[in-house]
Amino acid sequence: MELVLGYLFIFVARVTDVGMGTVRMIMVVKGKRIQAAAIGFVESIIYILAIGKVLEALDNPVNILVYATGFAAGNYVGIYIEERMALGNIIAQVMCDHNVMQLVDLLRDAGFGVTVVEGYGRTGIRHLLNVSLQRKNLSKLYNVLDTHDHKAFITVTDARSIRGGYFTSVKKK
């Protein structure tokens, strides 16, 4: 029983510390120093405890296998947590084929700020819609776009920071 509890400890510790590491890296990229430092502190303690348990019985290959499995699962869990947190801002660029101003009105009515840029494509004048939004509102943007033009061309990029502009609260349905 003690052996199984040891395996479980190693696995859970690795899932926890690697998951925290993934979230910590996102905090670093987003410039959230204090949160990244706090997560890193706890993460390193958990890591030392897990590796210490493995090194106690390095001749036990199951310890190493459980350690590696916990690492892999921790990456998965960390990405899942980061997706659920949906931190930060993004910029969506949208090109649609028809009724551009109707789409602009729909997006603005839904609470999104929209800037329209006119350009020239292969078939003539095209309109590019720039929409700056919080990442957590991306699915709401997709819902509005799908109801208007499910064939719209959309690119989404991360924005390190956004300053100024027109922002309202995205309206809930």
From Swiss-Prot:
**HAMAP family annotated for this entry?**
UPF0316
- Member of which family? Belongs to the UPF0316 family.
Sorted alphabetically, the Gene Ontology cellular component annotations on this record are: plasma membrane
Topology term for the membrane = Multi-pass membrane protein
PANTHER family, per database record: UPF0316 PROTEIN YEBE
User: What is the protein name stated in its UniProt record?
Assistant: UPF0316 protein Amet_0954
Q: Which InterPro entries match?
A: DUF2179, DUF5698, UPF0316
Compartment(s) where it occurs, according to its Swiss-Prot or TrEMBL record:
Cell membrane
Query: What residues form the membrane-spanning segments?
Result: 3-23, 38-58, 61-81
Superkingdom, according to UniProt? Bacteria
Identify the species of origin: Alkaliphilus metalliredigens (strain QYMF)
Sorted alphabetically, which keywords does the UniProt record give? Cell membrane, Membrane, Transmembrane, Transmembrane helix
Q: What is its main location?
A: membrane
